[in-house]
């Protein structure tokens, strides 16, 4: 689980140009990390590539925090 959290945070840091140390599990991509709609689309694509999964658009819209991304990935790995 920690490995997934770290991987998600690394991707978020790379995609949004923020310091990984500033990213918390409850960080909102838009409100806390300054992402815009294009950033969030690119972030979802990067997560799909990293974790070899597909995140449907209706689900991607619900993923607004680091923890929600981690939870979605964990649910898909079961």
From Swiss-Prot:
Keyword tRNA-binding carried by entry: no
GO molecular function term, any single one: acyl carrier activity
Pathway listed: Lipid metabolism; fatty acid biosynthesis
GO biological process: lipid A biosynthetic process
Localization of this protein: Cytoplasm
One Pfam match: PP-binding
A GO CC term assigned to this protein in UniProt: membrane
Keyword annotations: Cytoplasm, Fatty acid biosynthesis, Fatty acid metabolism, Lipid biosynthesis, Lipid metabolism, Phosphopantetheine, Phosphoprotein
Domain Carrier residues, every copy: 2-77
PANTHER family: ACYL CARRIER PROTEIN (PTHR20863), CARRIER DOMAIN-CONTAINING PROTEIN (PTHR20863:SF76)
Protein name: Acyl carrier protein
Species name: Dechloromonas aromatica (strain RCB)
Higher taxonomy: Bacteria, Pseudomonadati, Pseudomonadota, Betaproteobacteria, Rhodocyclales
């Amino acid at each position: 689980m920690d490995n997934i959290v770290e991987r998600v945070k690394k991707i978020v840091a790379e995609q949004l140009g923020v310091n990984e140390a500033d990213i918390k599990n409850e960080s909102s991509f838009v409100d806390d990390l300054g992402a815009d709609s294009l950033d969030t689309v690119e972030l979802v694509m990067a997560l799909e590539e990293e974790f070899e999964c597909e995140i449907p658009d209706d689900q991607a819209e619900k993923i607004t925090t680091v923890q929600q991304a981690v939870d979605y990935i964990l649910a898909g790995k079961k």
